[in-house]
From Swiss-Prot:
Family recorded in the similarity comment: Belongs to the SlyX family.
Domain of life: Bacteria
Chain segments annotated as transmembrane: none
PANTHER family, per database record: PROTEIN SLYX
Gene3D superfamilies in UniProt: 1.20.5.300
Protein name: Protein SlyX homolog
């Protein structure tokens, strides 16, 4: 009889560990999903900023080296 109780206790402990691991896995999965969402958003922002920078570089705005120096008073 004590052996059966021992086995039941071990099974209960293993079930608790599995439940904890399943919960941890679900939390990690959700964190990964959230991070992927943030990463996707950041990639879109980076593409937008790169496009804007390219537009600015190709515009008719002179660079600082091309600007004529201001008159000295």
């Amino acid at each position: 009889m004590p052996q059966t109780q021992e086995l039941d206790q071990r099974i209960a402990e293993l079930e608790m560990k599995i439940a904890f691991q399943e919960n941890t896995l679900e939390e990690l999965n959700q964190a990964l999903i959230d991070q992927q969402f943030v990463l996707d958003k950041m990639q879109l922002q980076l593409r937008y900023m790169a496009s804007k920078l390219k537009d600015l570089q190709s515009s008719n705005i002179a660079t600082q080296a091309e600007e004529t120096p201001p008159p000295h008073y």
